[in-house]
Amino acid sequence: MPRLEVSIRTRDGTCPASIFTPGDGPGGGKASWPGVIFFMDGLGIRPVMWEMGQRLADGGYLVLLPDLYYRTGPYSPMVASEVLADPNRREALMKLVRGLDRDRKVTDAGAFIEFLSSRPEVKGKRFGATGYCMGGNASLTAAGAFPDRFAAAASFHGGHLATEEPDSPHLFLGKLRGRVYVAGAVEDASFPDVQKDRLERVLSEAGVDHLIETYPGARHGFAVRDLPVYD
């Protein structure tokens, strides 16, 4: 079916979201699919996020793409080259990113889980989580906060995954029952080797099935097609 626009009630308001299901891909032709929460990157909802959501869905999933900036109201799709070249717009963007603290990420994730659990076309009670940039952080945060509800969690060039802050995502992953995949960039100051090693150690000690990779020559944002650093 085409992209379906829905509204999700959260503690702080109403979050608009898109649902994607398989089209003509290998996952099509079924009545229900495993659910995946797709956490957007810092530039927010825009056509490339919809494209990525549909591509993931075509692998055989129902994909939920929520607008994590719903608390600030509607906004026009952001163009990376324009936003990053304008100091004022860049700072406004970073304010949005910083506004998503752990408490908000966790309460939102709980609402998204409840929403997926209510959908008849979603199969099973354990879901997947994936995200890019700040969405990678949100993906691991959600999985750590609800360890029994996620079968897998992925982060692509997610930042600040294993910092020394008390709300760092790695501190809450010890009870996770699912698998974790982290793809980082060697040239990414938000996920340096010290964080990679710290995350590796925590997941290994907890016995969590995981794989962490960092790609030489890649930069933060390498996996999103409309970013200048896409590779």
What are the residue ranges of the model-derived segments?
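N-terminal cap/leader regions of alpha/beta-hydrolase-fold enzymes
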Residues: 1-231
